[in-house]
Amino acid sequence: MFWTRYAGASVLLFLMLIHLGQLYPRNYMNNFGCEECKLKENNIFSKPGAPVYQCMGCCFSRAYPTPLRSKKTMLVPKNITSEATCCVAKEFKQVLVNDIKLVNHTDCHCSTCYYHKS
Protein backbone atom coordinates (compact mmCIF):
# COMPACT_ATOMS: atom_id res chain seq x y z
CA MET A 1 0.00 0.00 0.00
CA PHE A 2 2.84 2.40 0.88
CA TRP A 3 4.60 1.69 -2.44
CA THR A 4 1.45 2.48 -4.40
CA ARG A 5 1.16 5.91 -2.79
CA TYR A 6 4.87 6.56 -3.32
CA ALA A 7 4.66 5.62 -7.02
CA GLY A 8 1.50 7.68 -7.49
CA ALA A 9 3.08 10.74 -5.86
CA SER A 10 6.22 10.33 -7.99
CA VAL A 11 4.21 10.17 -11.21
CA LEU A 12 2.16 13.22 -10.18
CA LEU A 13 5.33 15.19 -9.36
CA PHE A 14 6.89 14.18 -12.68
CA LEU A 15 3.83 15.32 -14.64
CA MET A 16 3.83 18.67 -12.79
CA LEU A 17 7.50 19.21 -13.65
CA ILE A 18 6.85 18.47 -17.33
CA HIS A 19 3.96 20.93 -17.33
CA LEU A 20 6.12 23.65 -15.72
CA GLY A 21 8.90 23.04 -18.25
CA GLN A 22 6.52 23.61 -21.14
CA LEU A 23 5.42 27.00 -19.79
CA TYR A 24 8.79 28.58 -20.68
CA PRO A 25 9.19 29.52 -24.35
CA ARG A 26 11.95 27.41 -25.86
CA ASN A 27 13.31 30.00 -28.27
CA TYR A 28 13.87 32.48 -25.42
CA MET A 29 15.99 29.99 -23.49
CA ASN A 30 18.00 28.96 -26.57
CA ASN A 31 18.92 32.49 -27.65
CA PHE A 32 19.38 34.03 -24.24
CA GLY A 33 21.56 37.11 -24.64
CA CYS A 34 22.20 36.63 -28.34
CA GLU A 35 20.41 37.94 -31.42
CA GLU A 36 19.88 36.09 -34.67
CA CYS A 37 22.50 36.15 -37.44
CA LYS A 38 22.06 39.37 -39.46
CA LEU A 39 23.85 42.38 -40.94
CA LYS A 40 24.82 45.19 -38.55
CA GLU A 41 26.60 48.43 -39.28
CA ASN A 42 30.24 48.59 -38.17
CA ASN A 43 30.50 51.94 -36.37
CA ILE A 44 34.32 51.99 -36.46
CA PHE A 45 34.76 51.87 -40.25
CA SER A 46 31.46 53.39 -41.41
CA LYS A 47 31.41 56.96 -42.70
CA PRO A 48 28.37 59.16 -43.35
CA GLY A 49 27.01 58.07 -46.72
CA ALA A 50 29.33 55.03 -46.86
CA PRO A 51 28.22 52.43 -44.30
CA VAL A 52 30.27 49.27 -43.75
CA TYR A 53 28.31 46.20 -42.64
CA GLN A 54 29.37 42.97 -41.02
CA CYS A 55 27.57 39.79 -40.01
CA MET A 56 26.87 39.44 -36.30
CA GLY A 57 24.71 37.17 -34.19
CA CYS A 58 24.29 33.62 -32.99
CA CYS A 59 23.75 30.35 -34.75
CA PHE A 60 23.44 26.70 -33.76
CA SER A 61 25.88 24.84 -31.53
CA ARG A 62 25.67 21.66 -29.49
CA ALA A 63 27.83 19.13 -27.68
CA TYR A 64 27.20 15.42 -27.16
CA PRO A 65 29.09 12.31 -26.00
CA THR A 66 31.44 10.96 -28.67
CA PRO A 67 30.21 7.63 -30.09
CA LEU A 68 32.53 4.74 -29.22
CA ARG A 69 32.96 3.84 -32.91
CA SER A 70 34.26 7.36 -33.65
CA LYS A 71 36.39 7.48 -30.53
CA LYS A 72 38.37 4.42 -31.68
CA THR A 73 39.47 6.18 -34.87
CA MET A 74 40.68 9.39 -33.17
CA LEU A 75 44.39 10.07 -32.74
CA VAL A 76 43.59 11.80 -29.45
CA PRO A 77 40.31 10.31 -28.14
CA LYS A 78 37.87 12.86 -26.71
CA ASN A 79 34.76 12.16 -24.66
CA ILE A 80 32.79 15.16 -25.95
CA THR A 81 32.12 16.03 -29.60
CA SER A 82 30.85 19.47 -30.54
CA GLU A 83 29.22 20.89 -33.63
CA ALA A 84 28.77 24.55 -34.38
CA THR A 85 27.76 26.94 -37.10
CA CYS A 86 28.80 30.57 -37.14
CA CYS A 87 27.31 33.76 -38.54
CA VAL A 88 29.34 34.33 -41.72
CA ALA A 89 29.06 36.42 -44.88
CA LYS A 90 27.15 34.76 -47.70
CA GLU A 91 27.98 37.62 -50.08
CA PHE A 92 30.40 40.53 -49.79
CA LYS A 93 32.03 43.36 -51.73
CA GLN A 94 35.49 44.90 -51.42
CA VAL A 95 35.39 48.59 -50.42
CA LEU A 96 38.09 51.21 -49.86
CA VAL A 97 37.82 53.31 -46.68
CA ASN A 98 40.68 55.72 -45.86
CA ASP A 99 42.99 53.80 -48.24
CA ILE A 100 42.22 50.56 -46.36
CA LYS A 101 40.67 47.62 -48.24
CA LEU A 102 37.70 46.27 -46.29
CA VAL A 103 35.18 43.51 -46.91
CA ASN A 104 31.64 44.90 -46.75
CA HIS A 105 29.19 42.08 -46.06
CA THR A 106 25.97 42.19 -48.08
CA ASP A 107 24.24 38.98 -46.91
CA CYS A 108 24.65 36.63 -43.92
CA HIS A 109 23.86 33.02 -43.07
CA CYS A 110 24.80 30.33 -40.56
CA SER A 111 27.56 28.09 -41.92
CA THR A 112 30.61 26.09 -40.84
CA CYS A 113 32.85 28.04 -38.48
CA TYR A 114 36.15 28.86 -40.19
CA TYR A 115 38.19 28.49 -37.01
CA HIS A 116 36.91 24.88 -36.60
CA LYS A 117 38.28 23.82 -39.99
CA SER A 118 41.73 22.24 -40.00
Curated annotation (Swiss-Prot):
**Naturally occurring in which organism (per UniProt):** Cyprinus carpio (Common carp)
GO-annotated cellular components: extracellular space; follicle-stimulating hormone complex
Chief subcellular location equals secreted
Stretch forming the signal peptide: 1-23
InterPro entries membership: Cystine-knot_cytokine, Glyco_hormone
Task: Relate the assembly described in the record.
Answer: Heterodimer of an alpha and a beta chain.
Provide the protein name.
Glycoprotein hormones alpha chain 2
Q: Which GO terms describe its molecular function?
A: follicle-stimulating hormone activity
| Function statement | Involved in gametogenesis and steroidogenesis.
